[in-house]
Amino acid sequence: MTDLSQKLILSLFPGIGLLDRAFEEKGFCVVRGPDLLWGGDIRQFHPPYGKFWGIIGGPPCQDFSGLRRCAPTGNGLEMLTEYARCVTEAQPKWWLLENVARVPNCDAPDYVTQRFDINQGWYCDVSRLRHIQFGSKSGRLLNVTGRRVTPNCDPAAVANDDRPFRELCRLQGLPDGFDLPGFLAVEKKRAVGNGVPLQMGRVLAQAVIDVYTSPRHTYQLNFAGQVTEARCGCGCGRPITGKAKYATNEQGDTSTCRKRAERNRKSPRATVWTAHG
């Protein structure tokens, strides 16, 4: 049995640590990197080489959000580049990036990258669509399969939410009595709304555990470090068989992956890429 407490995870852009909390609940030891919320600056941060098993984090998403009401500031792309730089410097076994659906692709050398969407409404009665990018040196892929969204879901908690703080905590899966001492009321709501829902974080943490502790599947890689076996055409990384172009969901159809591939063709994502330092 793998002792997860010996597996150091670096959290970038941790905020108030909701994604960190989910990984800690699953047994990982999480080290928090600098965050603007606490006066830190990732641009001045250089993680040590080879010390971290994995890296998790969600760079600021405002520039890529469909709810944005003003022109992009450029900060979003800069922070994505900083995330990729930290991955390249630290060289973990894997990295996981969480963001909004429109975020550009984030690539780093020597990693096979999987991209997929996940909805909080697959697991509870709150709907929140997010985009995940997972990079692995060994070619391992997370198994997170789309489901039907729970009917009559509550709207997700967001940074500018006007609902009570306690209600936002409930929607994010935080325990009764959770508080942020020293924060103004509006700052508390913004910090909680910006976090990764605990239920979603637990699913992602468990997916990492499953793929690294289950009997190993060896992926065939070519000299460019790319998986050579057939994969879904939408970029989610799931294997396909025969003449299929897209993977099937739990209902046995390919509509989710087909629609994602069509969106990608119509509006290709920009790519943030960092070379070896």
For the regions a language model picked out, list residue spans one by one.
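Class I S-adenosyl-L-methionine
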Residues: T2-S5, L12, Q44-G54, C61-F178, ...
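Short, conserved catalytic/metal-binding motifs centered on acidic residues
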Residues: I55, G193, E262-N264
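SAM cofactor-binding core of SAM-dependent methyltransferases
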Residues: K7-H46, G57
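Hydrophobic residues at beta-strand termini and immediately following loops
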Residues: P34, F116-I118, A247
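Class I SAM-dependent methyltransferase "Motif I" SAM/SAH-binding loop
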Residues: L12-I16, V192, C236
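Acidic-aromatic/histidine active-site loop/patch
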Residues: G201
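BZIP DNA-binding basic region
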Residues: N222-G277
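Short, hydrophobic alpha-helical segments
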Residues: A205-R216
